[in-house]
C-alpha cells in the first residue's frame, strides 16, 4: 500500500484508499498515478545560497533596467555578471530615477495617505489626519530570522495546529505559511521564526503526548523572545499574527488580562501596516504596492483578524478594536490549494465537511461576527441601559431573528437540521461554525431568562437557551466519538463554560423534572472539561469553580468515577496571579451584579453577570 494519495484523489479532494489502483480511479476508469514524495528532499546550503545570490542579481538588474532611460539600457546589459557574490539590496535612487519620480507627482491614492516603505515586504500606512509627511521614505529593518532549532518537533506541532485548531486561526493562510516554511529565506512575508514557535505553542496543546503538551510554555517563551529580538517596533504581518496567537494562548491558559493586551497589540500593529485598507488602491511611482495574489492574501488575513477580534471581545465582554465601517478590504476569495501538504490537513468526515472551502467558511463566520458585534453594541454596551429594559428586550428579539435568518440563509451544503447536527461534529471547521452560533445565542439570551414578553413562535430566552444547550451537547458528543477529546479545539472549552453558566441560571424557576435534566447537563460538561483539563488550563481551573457553584444548587454534580477525577490537577505547574482567578470567578458568580469596570472594560463579561 502506498503512503501517499494518488493525484486524481488529491485534485478531487476525496479520500484515497492508497491501493494501486485505488478504488476511486478504478471506478472512474482513470490511470492511478502516485507522485513521488519530495517533501523530505533538501538541497545543500551552498546550492541554496548560490540560487539566492543569482536571484538577487537578476532582481537588482531588472530594477535598474526598469527605471533607466533607453540609452543607458545597453550599458547596463553589458555590465551583467553571473557571479554568486552580488548583494540582494536594491540600488539607491539615481538621477534618472529621481527625475521619473518628480515627473509622477500625482499619487494614484485618492486620500492624502502616506506609505512608509520598510523593506521589500513591509509598508507602513499613515491616514489622512496623520502628522507625518506624505513623502515615501525607506527605513532599514532587520530581516526575519529563518533559523529554527531542530531540538523540538516543529513539524509535528504544526501538523497538530493546522489539523485541529486552524478554524479559529483563519488569519493565517496555511498554504502560504507552509510554502515559505519549506522554502526558507530571509525575506519571507508569511512565515517567520516567532510565528512558527507561536503556532507550535498552540499546536502541541492538542497532542496526546503529555511530554509534548508540557513543552507548550517553552514554545511560547521562544516565540516571545524571537519576536522581541526581531523588534516590536518593526511592524510585520507575521509579528501581528504571532501576537494574536500568543494572546489566544494566554486566554486559553486562564490569563485573560495578558491575552487581551497581546490581542490588542496585534490589531494595532495590523492597523500600522494598513491591513484594514484595500492595497489595490496603493501605488508608488505608478507601480502597485502589492500584487493581486498578495492583495487576496491580505484580505484573508484581515478578515481572519476581524473574526478573532469580535470573538475575543465577545467571550470577554469587552469593546472590539476593528470596525467593519473602517475597512475597504473586500471579502475573502478562494485561494489556490497547494499539493504536498496533506499531512497538515485533516481528512474531512461527512458530506458537509468535504464540500466547504476555507474562504466560504471564513465569509460565513464574518457575517456571524457582524451580528455579534451589533449585539455587543446594542444590547450589552453601557449606554444601552439608559433606554430601559423594554428596548433591550426588543433588541434581544431582533437579534434572535437575525441569527435565525443567518441560519436559514446558509448554503444547502452547510444548512443543518437537528437530525443532521451530529455530522457537523465530525469536522473541526464545521464544529467551530455551529458552536460559535450556539455560543452567541446563549450569551445573548442568558441575562434575560427571568424576563417575560411577547416572543415569536415561543422564542423565549429560556427556551432558546435550553434548546441551544442540547445542540451543544450533540456537537460535543459527535466530536468526542469521531475525533476524540484529546484534540479539542478551544471553542469547545468556551462552549462548556458558557453552557454551565447558563445551566446554573436555569435552575431558578425550574420544575423538579427540569432540575434533574439540568443536573445531568452539569455532569456532562464537567466530564468534558475534566478530559481536556490536561491540555487547557482554563478548563482545569473552571472545574473547581463549577463544582463549588453546583453545591449551591445541591446538584451533587459528579461525572462517572471511572472516567473523571475532580481532584486538583497535581501536574499543573502554571502560576496564576490572583487577578486571573478573579476573572475566572466572574464566569460563574452571578452574585457579582456590580462587576469591576477596571477588569472587565466598558462591557459586562458575557461569561457571567447580572440578570436583567
From Swiss-Prot:
Lineage, highest ranks first: Eukaryota, Fungi, Dikarya, Ascomycota, Taphrinomycotina
Localization annotation: Cytoplasm; Nucleus
InterPro entries attached to this UniProt entry: Transcr_Regulatory_Elem, Transcription_factor_dom_fun, Zn2-C6_fun-type_DNA-bd_sf, Zn2Cys6_DnaBD
A GO-annotated cellular component: cytosol
Gene3D superfamilies tied to this protein: Zn(2)-C6 fungal-type DNA-binding domain (4.10.240.10)
Keyword Cell inner membrane included in the entry's annotation: no
One of the GO biological process terms: regulation of transcription by RNA polymerase II
Record keyword Cytoplasm present: yes
Name by which UniProt lists this protein: Uncharacterized transcriptional regulatory protein C777.02
DNA-binding region: 6-32
Pfam families: Fungal_trans (PF04082), Zn_clus (PF00172)
Organism per entry: Schizosaccharomyces pombe (strain 972 / ATCC 24843) (Fission yeast)
Major localization listed first in the record, in broad terms: cytoplasm
